[in-house]
């Protein structure tokens, strides 16, 4: 499966934005420069200025019509993003979806090595790819510091995965002996939640400082998982 011409342009724009981000060390400047290069003003008479939702966290939104291939675009975006990061950064991705139905579909698609989306990711990362459901993460099923260091790790989760109002969501914040090996995993101490055990899944994910792919940004509900990767 190949990218269509407009999808190629989208990925090209993403790559250019990442280049500008490294060059200028300013999200808003990179954003404005990208649009200016296209002959589009940023401000009152043009595109709205960059809006910061999370301080220091670059955000990119692909606006794609229904059937426009947003999932394939997301799959093609992972490599350019990590290529722009220091190589020591763990290659971890939270693939966040809005509903259980989409969760099941996305997990099935990404774990199917014959599917075009998974094939693309495998090619980009030399077949060193692990896809995890929430239950697999909670169980520590092939999820450990060695695996995370050696592979691209994709966590397919829903908003409900972190809602403390739901019993299943609270599991992500509970002490978890299966994730004990991650206690020794180096991290930015400022990324951890207070009053939450260090072995909790939410703490492990925050340590990894993942890239977050949001499926359908219109319905995103912010949770405590609000420190996606700083590029």
Regions found by a protein language model. Name each.
Residues 1-231:
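RecA-like P-loop NTPase motor core of helicase/translocase proteins
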């Amino acid at each position: 499966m190949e990218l269509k011409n407009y999808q190629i342009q989208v990925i090209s724009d993403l790559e250019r934005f990442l280049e500008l981000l490294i060059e200028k060390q300013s999200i808003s400047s990179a954003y404005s420069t990208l649009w200016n290069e296209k002959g589009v003003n940023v401000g009152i008479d043009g595109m709205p200025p960059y809006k910061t939702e999370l301080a220091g966290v670059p955000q990119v939104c692909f606006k794609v019509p229904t059937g426009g291939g947003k999932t394939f675009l997301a799959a093609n975006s992972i490599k350019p993003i990590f290529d722009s990061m220091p190589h020591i950064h763990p290659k971890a991705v939270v693939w966040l979806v809005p509903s259980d139905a989409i969760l099941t579909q996305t997990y099935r698609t990404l774990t199917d090595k014959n599917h075009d989306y998974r094939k693309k990711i495998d090619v980009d990362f030399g077949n060193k790819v692990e896809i995890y459901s929430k239950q697999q993460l909670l169980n520590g099923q092939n999820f450990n510091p060695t695996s995370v260091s050696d592979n691209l790790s994709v966590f397919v989760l829903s908003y409900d995965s972190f809602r403390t109002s739901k019993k299943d969501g609270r599991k992500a914040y509970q002490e978890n002996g299966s994730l004990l090996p991650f206690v020794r995993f180096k991290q930015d101490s400022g990324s951890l939640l207070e009053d939450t055990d260090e072995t909790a899944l939410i703490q492990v994910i925050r340590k990894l400082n993942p890239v977050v792919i949001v499926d359908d940004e219109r319905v995103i509900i912010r949770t405590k998982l609000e420190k996606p990767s700083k590029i």
